[in-house]
């Protein structure tokens, strides 16, 4: 389970909550322009856009969960169990394995428009990363400074949806999630008028009553509605620090605390990390479950014309500022 959003404020932002019950020693990884991106069924990319994002610590390969390239194009993969359907190899199509999709797109495209133009023949082929790491059932939110789309590979084939709300969670299909927002059109960020009946004098006894009916549970459909409502009504200071802070507050409205979502006996899903990409400045911000301090890694502070991956383990231990 996860939630990803876009946000326009002082700059343009993209990020996600990564919710799971197991950590794979996540780290911020920069893939420089000359690091060879090797693919199973298509030509390798020996020179490409630089990429920054969160990866799993496996076999010195940039196995990205979410990432941004130097042009500001961003992608996040989110769980889509029971719906994702990967295909057999098709010689007439562009065969990319799901774990290759993020580096393949970010390595060569600079905008959502370019992505849409070049994935019409995309075939997400069913090839595992390794015997120990089978494919995860995913769908993807892709965004730039102007627009966002959702990519889903389902039984009926490849689906590409324009995403007018800039939000993605998990099941069911994105088009159904978007339609479901119609059920919440009466929600408001202001105090509602009494439309129950003119014959009954009803009191607005509390602030926030315009949000009555806003889902508060952790299911994917509820998180989609809550994240969309929070994001689309959110205000932030027109500064970098104010915008980034507000971005994490938006994600905080749908974060998961340990103990609330039992997956198996004694194992609970929780928000392992939250991220925020500044598309304009190339900065990757994050915080973790135990460390609420916002940390940052800048793509442009590194030498990007090299051939080796650059990695920074997540700062997961709590950080405190002693006032006295």
From Swiss-Prot:
This protein's UniProt keywords: Hydrolase, Lipid metabolism, Transferase
Which positions are annotated as binding deoxycholate?
2, 16
Family annotation (SUPFAM superfamilies): N-terminal nucleophile aminohydrolases (Ntn hydrolases)
One of the GO biological process terms:
bile acid biosynthetic process
Catalytic site residues?
Answer: 2
MF terms (GO), sorted A to Z: chenodeoxycholoyltaurine hydrolase activity; choloylglycine hydrolase activity; transferase activity
What's its catalytic activity?
glycocholate + H2O = cholate + glycine; glycodeoxycholate + H2O = deoxycholate + glycine; chenodeoxycholate + glycine = glycochenodeoxycholate + H2O; cholate + taurine = taurocholate + H2O
- Known EC number(s)? 2.3.1.-, 3.5.1.24, 3.5.1.-
- The entry's taurine-binding residues are 79
- The answer on whether this UniProt entry bears the keyword Phosphoprotein reads no
Stated pH dependence: Optimum pH is 4.7-5.5 for the hydrolase activity.
Biophysicochemical property: temperature dependence:
Optimum temperature is 30-45 degrees Celsius for the hydrolase activity.
Recorded hits in InterPro entries, A to Z, give:
CBAH, CBAH/NAAA_C, Ntn_hydrolases_N, Peptidase_C59
Query: Where does this protein act, in terms of pathway?
Result: Lipid metabolism; bile acid biosynthesis
* Keyword Hydrolase tagged: yes
Query: NCBIfam families attached here?
Result: bile_salt_hydro
Main role? Possesses dual functions in bile acid metabolism. Acts as a bile salt hydrolase that catalyzes the deconjugation of glycine- and taurine-linked bile salts, which occurs naturally in the intestines of animals, releasing amino acid residues and deconjugated bile salts (bile acids). Can hydrolyze the amide bond in the bile salts glycocholate (GCA), glycodeoxycholate (GDCA), glycochenodeoxycholate (GCDCA), taurocholate (TCA), taurodeoxycholate (TDCA) and taurochenodeoxycholate (TCDCA). Shows a preference for glycine-conjugated bile acids as substrates.
Query: Which family does the UniProt entry place this protein in?
Result: Belongs to the peptidase C59 family.
Oligomeric state and partners? Answer: Homotetramer. The tetramer consists of a dimer of dimers.
For this entry, the protein name equals: Bile salt hydrolase/transferase
Q: What gene name does this entry carry? A: cbh
């Amino acid at each position: 389970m996860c939630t990803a959003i876009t946000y326009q404020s002082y700059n343009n932002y993209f990020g996600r909550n990564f919710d799971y019950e197991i950590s794979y020693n996540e780290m911020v990884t920069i893939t420089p322009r000359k690091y060879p991106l090797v693919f199973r069924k298509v030509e390798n990319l020996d020179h490409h856009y630089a990429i920054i994002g969160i990866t799993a610590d496996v076999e010195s390969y940039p196995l990205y969960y979410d990432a941004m390239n130097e042009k500001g194009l961003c992608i996040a993969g989110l769980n889509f169990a029971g719906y994702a359907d990967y295909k057999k190899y098709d010689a007439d199509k562009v065969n990319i394995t799901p774990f290759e999709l993020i580096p393949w797109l970010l390595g060569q495209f600079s905008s959502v428009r370019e992505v849409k133009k070049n994935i019409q023949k995309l075939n997400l082929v069913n090839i595992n990363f390794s015997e120990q790491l089978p494919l995860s059932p995913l769908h993807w939110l892709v965004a730039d400074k102007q627009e966002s789309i959702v990519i889903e590979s389902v039984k009926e084939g490849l689906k590409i949806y324009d995403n007018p709300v800039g939000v993605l969670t998990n099941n069911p299909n994105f088009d159904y999630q978007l339609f479901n927002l119609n059920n919440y059109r009466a929600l408001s960020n202001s105090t509602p008028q009494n439309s129950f009946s003119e014959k009954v004098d009803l009191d607005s006894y509390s602030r926030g009553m315009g949000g009555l009916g806003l889902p508060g549970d952790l299911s994917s459909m509820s998180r989609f509605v809550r994240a969309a409502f929070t994001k689309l009504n959110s205000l932030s200071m027109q500064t970098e620090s104010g915008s980034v802070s507000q971005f994490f507050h938006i994600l905080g409205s749908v974060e998961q605390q340990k103990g609330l979502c039992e997956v198996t006996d004694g194992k609970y899903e929780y928000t392992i990390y939250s991220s925020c990409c500044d598309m304009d400045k190339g900065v990757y911000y994050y915080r973790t479950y135990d460390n609420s301090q916002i940390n940052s890694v800048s793509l442009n502070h590194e030498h990007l014309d090299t051939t080796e991956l650059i990695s920074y383990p997540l700062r997961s231990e709590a950080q405190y500022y002693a006032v006295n």
